[in-house]
């Protein structure tokens, strides 16, 4: 507690020269090199791991501020700074902030679609979205809540969007029988009829606690305890849904076709709107499959496939990637993804969800994307066999 008070007090008194770890000239070269090394080792992708450090120097005295999700990275940093002769005041916060969260280091998404942002502000760029009933890790609370989703993505969500719970409460939620929303869009009502007051909207993939049935409706409970009724025509019990689930390419492609015309939305991962990788993630999640969030992450799971000139080595359900091809001066860069559906055609979200073709003779020919085609990956055979490819039955967040 004394250390925390000193960190707060000293943050108000400019005794040190403040330097950011992002290359500020006031950081000694040996410290900058150490920081770069630790980031490469412990947080190479800040979408899923954090090591954000601000340094304040006064000769060989240094104050550390910022946050990290890696206890090991913090321990190595402190040890190496001491070895280099620095006297360290440690105000680097290890997430989750267990004390600040009062033990509620878990959470459940409490709105149909929760917008997740770079910073805790409505004007901040949206990074991704999460769906009602989804279990998350709560890392930090500052008016807004910093969470980590089952695909390990880290971002800020408004406090209304997530219901904080303890680990024990999370386990209870995960074990409870649930209703899964199967329609792209719908509502929960305050009474078992569609003329009553709405409680909220819902989208495909939302999960609510199942409390029983009344006529043509399921009685459900929200993560925060609200109650309502949802039509049996747009939802079903999770166990029944899972027993009839098809996780093959044909079934997933049929689901993809049901989203035709849905508008492109940057960072979108719901049937309200999707970006390219969000579309892949959404249609797979409708089949209980969890994959990494972004195209640049999805590109490196499953089996890599160098696409044949006639596309003969592709199979329906393969993910196909587009972007900047490698040159002697620049690395390859993935910026877009779609799903191969056969016959040299693919379905993707670009403007809206639609089908395009690699065949110049096809009326759906897409010359632009053919020109930036990179490679494909085959992910379906590797579900639950490779890190980053799993289901809600095996993902640690759902246990």
Predicted features, each with a name:
Residues 9-129, 134, 159-165, 237:
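N-terminal targeting leaders
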Residues 291-355, 361:
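...with weaker cross-activation on analogous glycine-rich loops/strands in unrelated enzymes
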Residues 1-8:
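Short, small-residue-biased leader/transition segments that mark boundaries at the very start
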Residues 256, 268-287:
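Active-site nucleophilic cysteine motif
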